[in-house]
UniProtKB/Swiss-Prot annotation:
Phylogenetic placement of the source organism: Eukaryota, Viridiplantae, Streptophyta, Embryophyta, Tracheophyta
Molecular function as annotated in GO: methylated histone binding; transcription cis-regulatory region binding; zinc ion binding
The keyword Transit peptide belongs to this UniProt entry's keyword annotation: no
GO annotation, biological process: chromatin organization; regulation of DNA-templated transcription
Subcellular location: Nucleus
Full protein name: PHD finger protein ALFIN-LIKE 1
Entry comment, domain topic: The PHD-type zinc finger mediates the binding to H3K4me3.
Pfam families with a match to the protein in the record: Alfin (PF12165), PHD (PF00628)
Species per Swiss-Prot/TrEMBL record: Arabidopsis thaliana
Sites marked Histone H3K4me3 binding: Y195, W201, D205, W210
Gene Ontology CC terms, in alphabetical order: nucleus
Tissue specificity statement from the Swiss-Prot or TrEMBL entry: Ubiquitously expressed.
Gene name per UniProt: AL1
């Protein structure tokens, strides 16, 4: 069995597919690592590690059809297993798996427009790579390292742990110059536009995506009175459940 195929079309669907496959890889390289290691017998033929959209993983031979329906992962990951230290081999597999995840997402995203591709890459880039997780450079549960923990809007409103809001304009003004550099690659989850410090932004407490206030019809004054902000997409998902 080769890579399980789905047919995601939208940014959200492609990111969901990416996240599912990534979860499968993470499981193979952490929780199920002993099983994965034993399956990669160097005496076997060219083996590949597949991550599936449902969060499962599989070690198998590559697809027989040429060209394959999806881009293929690295061939022969089993051959190098006994010639390297275990941690180095797992790191190598992680790097190749990162490359495959990006290639599959690029394949599905071929028909997206420029802003949609930027949104998709921004969502993907918010997650630590498999290599970072395997080597311990970043934990599996990773927020944006450049954002203040608990900060939900960029106009100087910071949420405290108790859910209350307090204005910190001086702190934000002092950090605007650095913030431009840190958040320059952040994209609005609605329009796909880049972050600039002269606009009001707000972050969804559920999916943690950032939005222009004008795109989701939230003003700085209204943000002050919101204890937990949910973006339109998360509100819609909850309504369907």
């Amino acid at each position: 069995m080769a890579a399980e195929s789905s047919n995601p079309r939208t940014v959200e669907e492609i990111f969901k597919d990416f996240s599912g496959r990534r979860s499968g890889f993470l499981r193979a390289l952490s929780v199920d690592v002993d099983k994965f290691y034993s399956l990669c017998d160097p005496e076997m033929e060219n083996l590949c590690l597949y991550g599936h959209p449902n969060g499962t993983w599989e070690v198998n031979l590559p697809a027989e059809e040429v060209p394959p329906e999806l881009p293929e992962p690295a061939l022969g990951i089993n051959f190098a297993r006994d010639g390297m230290q275990r941690k180095d081999w797992l790191s190598l597999v992680a790097v190749h798996s990162d490359c495959w995840l990006l290639s599959v997402s690029s394949y599905f995203g071929a028909r997206l427009n420029r802003n949609e591709r930027k949104r998709l890459f921004s969502l993907i880039n918010d997650l630590p790579t498999l290599f970072e997780v395997v080597t311990g450079r970043k934990p599996i549960k990773d927020g944006k390292p450049s954002m203040d923990l608990g900060s939900k809007s960029r106009n100087g409103v910071k949420r405290s742990i108790e859910g209350q809001t307090k204005s910190t304009p001086k702190l934000m003004e002092e950090s605007y110059e650095d913030e431009d550099d840190e958040h320059g690659d952040t994209l609005c989850g609605s329009c796909g536009g880049n972050y600039t410090n002269d606009e009001f932004w707000i972050c969804c407490d559920v999916c943690e995506r950032w939005y222009h206030g004008k795109c989701v019809k939230i003003t700085p004054a209204k943000a002050e009175s919101i204890k937990q902000y949910k973006c339109p997409s998360c509100c819609t998902k909850k309504g369907r459940q």
